[in-house]
UniProtKB/Swiss-Prot annotation:
NCBIfam families: CysD (TIGR02039), PRK05253.1 (NF003587), PRK12563.1 (NF009214). With CysN forms the ATP sulfurylase (ATPS) that catalyzes the adenylation of sulfate producing adenosine 5'-phosphosulfate (APS) and diphosphate, the first enzymatic step in sulfur assimilation pathway. APS synthesis involves the formation of a high-energy phosphoric-sulfuric acid anhydride bond driven by GTP hydrolysis by CysN coupled to ATP hydrolysis by CysD. Heterodimer composed of CysD, the smaller subunit, and CysN. GO terms for biological process: hydrogen sulfide biosynthetic process; sulfate assimilation. GO terms for molecular function: ATP binding; sulfate adenylyltransferase (ATP) activity. InterPro entries: PAPS_reduct_dom, Rossmann-like_a/b/a_fold, SO4_adenylTrfase_ssu, Sulfate_adenylyltrnsfr_sub2. Belongs to the PAPS reductase family. CysD subfamily. Signal peptide: none annotated. The gene is cysD. Its EC number is 2.7.7.4. Pathway: Sulfur metabolism; hydrogen sulfide biosynthesis; sulfite from sulfate: step 1/3. It comes from Maricaulis maris (strain MCS10) (Caulobacter maris). This is Sulfate adenylyltransferase subunit 2. It catalyses: sulfate + ATP + H(+) = adenosine 5'-phosphosulfate + diphosphate.
Length: 303
């Protein structure tokens, strides 16, 4: 049960997000929610459950499994699906898995392209989704800051930042041709702090990796990489150290850096966020593989 009522600020954000979700449900034939298992997905799912209560959300959840997600993420995903009775469709690029594509031998750029972007495009095409909810926020990264809430994608699922529609006074253009689609970002106007305060006040379950705990990590290029399984190759003389760390953002474990932290409760995480001076995505290695990489990925069909 929530310990305190929502602030006026969070109530306004919640109302806007639920309005967007209901608009999509009314205007599109085959929407889907992209579920990455992280904190933003947790908030987005919670909002969907509230927006359509007492019914279930009128769309499935789609998870793209790169095969390198943290084990705790997959365990959490399956538990949430069972607890809430939701349909979560899981997409894996089987061709990429057969080729042994991985971030160690092939690098983060190719791994992300094959195991995430191509897998997502395949799922979008096969299921004929015409709208897909995503948990991106404008405060995360510069290319996301300029993206519309209703983001038009062409028949190849690509994003053209020069081909965007005006969004005035919460009016959204939902018209598309066959084969085109819209990526919808109901959390666009939320900040990382908003997300954590909402999780705290709504008592939303999240992956335990967000809480500080002693975990085996190695330091590489200034990032603390958690040794989540035996696939992480050790360099000469390298040995995992147990450190008190947590994650601000979650993705493929070899490409996601932890931060040293003692925040083990939601209240402590919120306090930590009040003094944070770095972006949460500073720990995502895929954002550093080339200049403008996020925009390039989105042009190719990335989340």
């Amino acid at each position: 049960m929530r310990a305190r009522p929502l602030s006026a600020h969070l109530k306004a954000l919640e109302a806007e997000s639920m309005h967007i979700m209901r608009e999509v449900a009314a205007e599109f034939d085959n929407p889907v929610m992209l579920y990455s298992i992280g904190k933003d997905s947790a908030v987005m799912l919670h909002l969907a459950l509230k927006a359509f209560y007492p019914s279930r959300p009128p769309f499935p959840l789609q998870h793209v499994d790169s095969t390198f997600k943290f084990k705790e993420m997959i365990t959490f995903r399956d538990a949430i699906a069972e607890e809430l009775g939701l349909e979560i469709r899981v997409e894996i690029n089987e061709d990429g898995r057969a080729r042994g594509i991985n971030p160690f031998d092939h690098g983060s750029q190719l791994h992300t392209q094959v195991m995430k972007t191509e897998a997502l495009r395949s799922a979008m095409t096969r299921h004929k989704y015409d709208a897909a909810f995503g948990g991106a926020r404008r405060d995360e990264e510069k290319s996301r800051a300029k993206e519309r809430i209703f983001s038009f994608r062409d028949t190849n699922h690509g994003w053209d930042p020069k081909n965007q529609r005006p969004e005035l006074w919460s009016n959204y253009n939902t018209k598309i041709k066959q084969g085109e689609s819209i990526r919808v970002f109901p959390l666009s106007n939320w900040t990382e702090l908003d997300i954590w305060q909402y999780i705290l006040e709504e008592d939303i379950p999240i992956v335990p990796l967000y809480y500080a705990a002693h975990r085996p990590v190695v330091e590489r290029d200034g990032q603390l990489i958690m040794v989540d399984d035996e696939r992480l190759p050790m360099k000469d003389g390298e040995k995992p150290d147990l450190k008190l760390v947590r994650f601000r953002t979650l993705g493929c474990y070899p490409l996601t850096g932890a931060i040293e932290s003692s925040a083990q409760t939601l209240e402590e995480i919120v306090l930590e966020m009040l003094t944070a001076r770095t972006s949460e995505r500073s720990g995502r290695l895929i954002d550093h593989d080339e200049s403008g990489s996020m925009e390039k990925k989105k042009r190719e069909g990335y989340f």
